[in-house]
């Protein structure tokens, strides 16, 4: 702990000779999920939203932005797009295994936000569907 009560600074490793820009898995991950809308789309997917209009309504996101983010998530195998209705044709978006494995990251962001950014404490209660 830092004397001011904040977290202690971590000293950089000076003996590491790796090109961090090329080898950084954090940077590579942020290329996929690093913008506000993408994280919120993933949050809503974990909440059970599946269809374009559901995401649009919940997030109040411009249609073109939502279409772009969903397309990118599908291209990167974080979500899969499946037809769920034939007439008219409608699609749903579901998390892949890769997408599901983002769960701890979203939970960590929520916990960090609850701790450091929320004046009233935790606004969200997580309940596991199978365990209650």
List each language-model region with its residue ranges:
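Basic, amphipathic "hinge/linker" alpha-helix immediately C-terminal to the N-terminal HTH DNA-binding motif
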Residues: 34, 85-108
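Amphipathic alpha-helical dimerization/coiled-coil segments
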Residues: 104-132
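N-terminal leader segment of winged-helix/HTH proteins
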Residues: 1-33
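Canonical helix-turn-helix DNA-binding module
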Residues: 52, 56-84, 88
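Short histidine
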Residues: 10-13, 19-20, 38, 42, ...
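Generic leucine side-chain signal with a strong bias for well-ordered alpha-helical environments
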Residues: 30, 40, 66, 70-73, ...
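N-terminal helix-turn-helix DNA-binding core of bacterial DNA-binding proteins
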Residues: 24-65
